């Protein structure tokens, strides 16, 4: 199967990327804010929802980055820190402010979230190659709790230089 490559320039495009990253697994050390470049990057092990019906469930290593990031805030997670606790990405949402600006929110199971204030939507996703079979499909019972977690205050992360 071919490697997935997607770009998002509007909220609809970002919704497509969110669907492909639903149930992706990553760690805090897989996330970084590159302040000097106004870029937020991540590497995840995404569940391959596009696999043929009847094929064994599998995951793929995927990289993604947001450009034109003005500020990063987080709750329940510190991007770039060493942690063995896996994070499960439930969704990426976008709330417009003054067009074309807005806030993208990465919603994780268990109530963790990262908010990115964006000058505009410029996102790229690319599979990095490896694919492996896994046991079972993701369980979506935590989705409602994770989406409800977007509400409330998020602690402001490092918005200056280096990794947040």
Residue ranges of each PLM-predicted region?
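Surface-exposed, interaction-prone regions used to assemble/regulate multi-protein complexes
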Residues: 1-164
């Amino acid at each position: 199967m071919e490697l997935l490559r997607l770009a998002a320039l509007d909220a609809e495009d970002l919704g497509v990327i969110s669907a492909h990253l639903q149930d992706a697994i990553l760690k805090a050390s897989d996330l970084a804010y590159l302040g000097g470049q106004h870029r937020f990057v991540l590497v995840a092990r995404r569940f391959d929802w596009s696999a043929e019906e009847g094929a064994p469930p599998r995951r793929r290593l995927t990289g993604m980055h947001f450009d034109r990031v003005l500020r990063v805030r987080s709750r329940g997670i510190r991007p770039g820190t060493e942690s063995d606790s896996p994070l499960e990405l439930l969704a990426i949402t976008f709330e417009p402010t003054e067009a074309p600006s807005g806030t993208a929110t990465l919603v994780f199971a268990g109530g963790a979230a990262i908010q990115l204030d964006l000058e505009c939507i410029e996102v790229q996703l690319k599979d990095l190659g490896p694919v492996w079979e896994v046991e079972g499909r993701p369980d979506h019972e935590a989705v409602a709790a994770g989406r409800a977690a977007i509400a409330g205050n998020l602690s402001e992360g490092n918005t200056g230089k280096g990794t947040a």
